[in-house]
Amino acid sequence: MDAPEEPQPPVVYTMENKPIVTCAGDQNLFTSIYPTLSQQLPREPMEWRRSYGRAPKMIHLESNFVQFKEELLPKEGNKALLTFPFLHIYWTECCDTEVYKATVKDDLTKWQNVLKAHSSVDWLIVVVENDAKKKNKTNILPRTSIVDKIRNDFCNKQSDRCVVLSDPLKDSSRTQESWNAFLTKLRTLLLMSFTKNLGKFEDDMRTLREKRTEPGWSFCEYFMVQEELAFVFEMLQQFEDALVQYDELDALFSQYVVNFGAGDGANWLTFFCQPVKSWNGLVLRKPIDMEKRELIQKQEATLLDLRSYLFSRQCTLLLFLQRPWEVAQRALELLHSCVQELKLLEVSVPPGALDCWVFLSCLEVLQRIEGCCDRAQIDSNIAHMVGLWSYAMEKLKSLGYLCGLVSEKGPNSEDLNRTVDLLAGLGAERPETANTAQSPYKKLQEALSSVEAFEKHYLDLSHATIEMYTSIGRIRSAKLVGKDLAEFYMRKRSPQKAEMYLQGALKNYLAEGWALPVTHTRKQLAECQKHLGQMENYLQTSSLLASDHHLTEEERKYFCQEILSFASQQEDNPGHKVVLPMQFARLKDLHFDPPNAVVHAGGVLTVEITVCSQMPIPVHVDQIAVNVHFSIEKNNYRKTAEWLTKHKTSNGIITFPAEASLFPASQNSLPALELSEMLERSPSDNSLNTTGIICRNVHMLLRRQESGSSLEPPSGLALEDGAHVLRCSSVTLQPGANKIAFKTQAKEPGTYTLRQLRASVGPVWFVLAHIHPIVQYDVYSQEPQLHVEPLADSLLAGIPQKVKFTVTTGHYTVKNGDSLQLSNVEAMLILCQAENRAVVYSNSREECSTALLRIQSSDKVTSIGLPTAPAYHVIEFELEVLSLPSAPASGGDTSVPGTPELHRKQKDSQRAGHCMVTTDHKVSIDCPWSIYSTVIALTFSVPFRTEHSLLSAGTRKYVQVCVQNLSELDFELSDSNLEDKGHATDLRLAPLNTQSQQLIHSKQSVFFVWELTWTQEPPPPLHCQFSVGFSPASEEQLTVSLKPYTYEFQVENFFTLYSVRAEILPASGAEYCKTGSLCSLEVSITRLADLLDVDKDEALVESEDYFSTKLMYEVVDNSSNWAVCGKSCGVIAMPLAAQATHRVHMEVMPLFAGYLPLPDVRLFKYLPHHSAHASQLDADSWIENDSLSVDKHLDDQLDCSSLRSRGSTHSTSSSEHKGLPMPRLQALPAGQVFNSSTGMQVLVIPSQDDHVLEVSVT
């Protein structure tokens, strides 16, 4: 302890540094225990809980145990943590009280006094118990007495600062327990010391950083302080925390540089603005670059020195963290930021010095990463390293240009001097790389030594970079490097090698739509093609560049003149043609005349195109031609003027899509920009520092567009040969839009498709291989046609109607004297008027001429003279035709409309008959251009529908005629008349209509009534003809007299034979009928005439005194107001004598209160079947069964439900008579039965005991 003080060696800052623990007391004892202690201490981890809420960590503690010396204790103001002893241990194995008092106690007292003098409170006393010594000394006190004395003398309130280690060199459980307790205590005290001292150090460091705005603050001094903290974390193997310290220093220095660029510079930054004199690159092969650290400590480091040292420390820690790819990423950012920081600080850098530093640094980082990773790891992480390869290649290229190693003649003396100066700035090679054959230093020195060496190194770097970019899918970057390589080959006069790279880059830029790179690459490619003598390719590229608006006007004119000069030089060799794509001009639109692009054979068609020239100067074109492909359409109908007119564009203008981009990656296919505002404010006063716009989907916008097809125009262009070509010679194309017109005379019918547009300038032909969209014009040859159609929707019979005649001449020329011969139809007249005119139209519907029609009519033929007209014209004229009106004769007699069923039948038939009756007239027309007749059919609709009915009032009879107007016109009816065509003298028709003229509107009806009287009984049948004059109500006076409308019908057996009367009487003693009470129904059937011829049928029965006939009556109540009780029908024998009456009595019950209409009483003729079986049966039995048959002439609406309902209860009887001949019911003719009770009503009052009152209102 009292040995003479030895000079302490300087602290070596290496990765082997460990926390210092001093050892005082028995050094021999510690030496014997040290191997076990150093091995056991880091074995178990301890949880380190740090201040400021930082997450706890598990650490393995190691220590550097050194002999205690007072010089090791830190002095006031010393901030070095690496030399700071974190714990002091005193070792003793004293077991004798006398020895303790004589020596140990005094030594402990001196030791503690020294610690107290330096304010060190982290100490520990270790008493080692040894059983061997205990056996040798029998009179010693127990061990505990020595420990107790030490604790009483030195520990006072800190008894845990004295620990016992029992037999540390033995292998026993007791020894192991003692070691575990000791090691736990030692680790705990060490962690407590770390936490306390590091916390104090961080507070002091934070206080120093907060003084950075004071004038005397030094970044280098602060750098050393925070790096001391990083060293401690590294010493504790907390590499992440150590890296954070360097990152904070990096960010702090970068912010000061940015502020300096903005005009807010710190005074200490001037130390880093000194000129750069050394550019030997990064040093990454040793943990700490002490030379640069000393320069920083002395404030003599340049910006490159500081950045190099700072990155070397970050690199070391990242490699310990096994994150080598982050080293590459950070290195690339560092190199770029250093270049910018040198510009911001305006540091003087010799030309090429920074390129050397970047090149050496890139290779140093790459070799450092390759040294700690295997080949598989490197291959899978090329994406992180390729940026450094590319940057190194770029800087080597800059050095080559700077030192004249790329020029054709090689470096000159000035270039050599510059090379010597650059190599001198590299200094001597570092010892750690002196024995490495491919060290960055040697590579740079070799590359700058000769032209051949530079080319070798540059090509190696370029090819390696291209291969790496391609392998990771960064095709754009690979093509960009390829462009640089092409530029290098062009300088080396090797254009054949450069072309491949330029073509690849151009294809990529075209695929993705990068306009400016396309222009720049094409310029390089044009130069390359010119050197190679590829004249066709050069002219093609020149035409693209001449029309490229990204170039200046002078550049565009130069390339345009190149094309014109070549064309003028080749005029001596007219047979040689150079075919190029038409890139300098764009087809804008095309206009046809006629507009529908349809012309007849022999007609003239004009095609006018608009060509936009993108040349900067007017270009004289020898010839512009359009190659036309001819095809014959098999479908002849497609060639008719009608079809072509309907299916062609009306304006005749076809617009071609603007080729806004030759690139498939058009703006329409890209997603919309997602822009957001970015504001950065100062944390101190919230003032706005920077503002900008961020694109959040830039990864989508800049994504590569794969393209499998070539985007350059196809090289195999050829001029199409054909017989059909539209030409226009000697045209000067001005910059912008130029209109060029082609005229052609159509000869052969078919479809002509415009295929290829070409322009010639001397032997140079510019070709637009395909015109898209498809452009066609049609030439047709049409047969003459005649088309007849009404002007209205439908032709009405009976009034003059206009018909339009359309003659399409087709290829036929109508000569003077040609006429249409119409065969006359008996029921249709052709009205001739003096003012009839024919109009001749051209094929484009332009009126050519008008002429009066020459119409000559005879009994059989009407001749219409046609005006002269050339081929493919249209003749139109109108004629009036008149179809004679008629109505179909009625089929026979109508029923007497006395019952509701008959009214319903009439209404239903009216609903079904709202369509007009039509009449077809076929007219045969002979045309001058054909030997065959043309037959046309004209359909006329009869505007009226007529119905008749017989009305009865007792024995008086009336005939009613209903005329319904089904057309859309209003008519005026006049002179209605009804006459007997049989001319019977004993019949007379007396009209009851007072008006001579009546207006009938559309969809309305007019009724006419006549009273029918006769003098002979019975009257004969009536055969009538109704006629009425009509004319359109809206027309003026017609020039032709119209025939009246006629309608014929016949009425037979219209006289009254039977009169039926029904009467309902209340119950006996009651004044009114009541609901629910039986009432008496009296039906009387009266014969009004004696035996007539109409009665002589199967129902006639002859007796001794008179004739009779069998009738069946039926009482029916369709309105369900009455309930018939008992039988509702029966068969009676009616005497055939005038005034013979048959009465029937039955009971009915009213179901509702109110005025109720009487039930209907119906009469039928009952016709028995004359057979043996039938004569043996009673008539009533026939009525009762369910097998009554009704004559097929019976009215459809006859309701026999009562019969069926009664018969359903006698199904057994019905089955018994199955197969027997059945009687028949026959309806009486219309008008023979008159029901005088029709329309009568009976008052029914409600019963007094009804709880619910139901009243029927009719």
Curated annotation (Swiss-Prot):
It is found in: Golgi apparatus, cis-Golgi network. Disruption phenotype: Gene-null mice have smaller total brain area compared to wild-type animals, with specific reductions in the size of the corpus callosum, regions of the hippocampus, anterior commissure, and internal capsule. Only white matter structures are affected in mutant mice. There is a loss of myelination in these regions, but oligodendrocyte numbers are normal. GO terms for cellular component: cytoplasm; TRAPPII protein complex. Keywords: ER-Golgi transport, Golgi apparatus, Phosphoprotein, Transport. InterPro entries: Ig_TRAPPC10, TRAPP_II_complex_TRAPPC10_C, TRAPPC10/Trs130, TRAPPC10/Trs130_N. Pfam families: Ig_TRAPPC10, TRAPPC10, TRAPPC10_1st. One of its GO terms (biological process) is vesicle tethering. It comes from the Eukaryota. The keyword Phosphoprotein applies. Residues 1201-1214 have a biased composition (Low complexity). The modification Phosphoserine is found at S707. Residues 888-913, 1201-1222 are annotated as: Disordered. Residues 901-911 have a biased composition (Basic and acidic residues). Belongs to the TRAPPC10 family. Specific component of the multisubunit TRAPP II complex, which includes at least TRAPPC1, TRAPPC2, TRAPPC3, TRAPPC4, TRAPPC5, TRAPPC6A/B, TRAPPC9, TRAPPC10 and TRAPPC14. TRAPPC9, TRAPPC10 and TRAPPC14 are specific subunits of the TRAPP II complex. Interacts with TRAPPC14. Specific subunit of the TRAPP (transport protein particle) II complex, a highly conserved vesicle tethering complex that functions in late Golgi trafficking as a membrane tether. This is Trafficking protein particle complex subunit 10. It comes from Mus musculus (Mouse). The gene is Trappc10.
